[in-house]
Amino acid sequence: MRDLAYLRLLAREYPNVQAASSEIINLMAIRGLPKGTEYFFSDLHGEYEAFVHLLRSASGIIREKISETFGYVISDEDEIALANLIYYPERGLRAAKRENRFTEDWQRITIYRLVCICKEVSSKYTRSKVRKKMPPAFAYIIDELIHVDYSDENKKVYYDEIIRSIIDSEMGAEFIEALCNLIQNLTIDNLHIIGDIFDRGPRADIIMEELMKFHDVDIQWGNHDISWMGAATGNLACICNVLRIAIRYNCFDLLEDGYGINLRPLSMFAARVYRDDACEHFMPKILDENIYDAVDPGLAAKMHKAIAVIQFKVEGQIIKRHPEYNMEDRLHLTRINFEKGTVTIKGKEYPLTDKKLPTVDPKDPLKLTKEEEELIHNLCMSFKHSVNLQRHIRFVYSHGAMYKCCNSNLLYHGCIPMKENGDFDEIKFNGIIYSGKRMLDYIEDAVKMAYFLPDDDTSKEWYKDLMWYLWCGPKSPVYGKDNMATFEGYFVADKAAAKENMNPYYKLSTKEEFCDKILREFGLPVEGSHIINGHVPVKLKDGESPIKGNGKLFVIDGGLAKSYQPKTGIAGYTLIFNSRHLALAEHKLAEYCDVFCETGVFTPAESQRILTAAQKLGLGAKIHADEIDPIGGSQLAGQIGA
């Protein structure tokens, strides 16, 4: 009966033998083409500038395509200029107009070169697929240009006439921008984000806008994504958590400009309650300056401490509601000796580094004050009614999952929880035990329930609490550690108290036999399949390798986030899977800032601003100057020591 239902659905699209045969022929022909290129990124952590550049440049592949297409026909400077135009067409076109380079000749040459690159990057796709990626306004024209026969003199005249008409009708800029965007889209056929779009970096919202413009993207949820998803549902612990991390890393632009979260009540509360407290253990880590919402570090520290204390209270309330989480050891506020100024953690007493907790009642440490209750209620309303946040989170839901099987690759962010003996670890939800694939399937359904169930559904709160557990719980597949020592990091000096033990998965998965076990669990063949994983930064500088399990496992968190780069020694990885091979691109940390101070690239004034800023960041200065025209680059090099 079920087969008959499927056949009836197919009959709507293919009502007769001819229609079905035509589609079979089409699909068989497509199978003969090379597969599209897939790109895998992990742990973006709000680093929008780095990610957007990697995405638009296809991690350097577009520059390679330019070199392959033109060889020695154009200079290195022209290659760089063309590449930058493709990556950032709006910026490049503005510069061309500002510098009076936007002539008919420049437009004609640029369009010709872009069409050549389009032909190169579209060669592995069907004409139909390429047309679907074209901007509708220019689809017919672009289709004609990239399929013209240059050996036919009549067609060559036709080709030249099309370009001349584009320029004469003053549509050159729009057409060039359309070609640049098409090249970007054709170079990356499928984009996979292996979790953690949010937290630490300055503007996860800009990353989300970029992802939402992309034609084919999927997301495997990470623990930081889950925390923001939980915050969007109104889970108080998740709201406190994302606020705490954002304030800790000075991400006020994300909160206020990106998502319109009203932080004024929090700042007023913190300034009043912690007026005489320097909050030195809560000073923000300033990796990026705020552009729109600069906040004094002293006030930020008070806000940081205020929201952290509220977080510990509401987390404790969740733990009390759910003894099945087995997280009673995290009830640190209840284990403080306020007279002695100590806290007992796992049976050992430690002195508190910060004893100023004016809102914590020793008789009922987990109870919120009336002011705290009002504050967290207002913050909750701000999160639930943020149009941009809710729009982004709905996209994370609609394009995301706990894992994905695609082209013999198994994608997930954190881990598949395991025991020391190599068996899949178990977790009980509502009286039913889950492990392995079944655990991830159940959690995926539960995550959706937390967001999409109506507010008056009595079970919704249970699912919302589970979102917090997934952020930091000992058997959470997106977290992968036995505990999260946030409290210890703020209040205990002894680093041993803050130790977080990794799930046995991370040791076992370095062996091929356990990778094979996981692949079989998810229904993938052992031969030719791979696991693609993120979450744990690969410390390349300490000799760690991103490739494990005899080539079966790729860990691609290489430190795109600035906060991790001192640990990894690099600036991240991109995994690229094309029709020929699976390749891992390693992104080096910059040592120099190299500027082309030339006509049509950067002026001396622009070059000076760029290089001065680079030197403040500790980068060396290099300059290409006066190779085309003597515009003052050599003098600038002498002035700044480039």
Residue ranges and their predicted role:
Residues 1-591:
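Feature recognizes metal-dependent phosphohydrolase scaffolds
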Residues 590-642:
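Histidine/acidic residue-rich metal-binding segments in metalloenzymes
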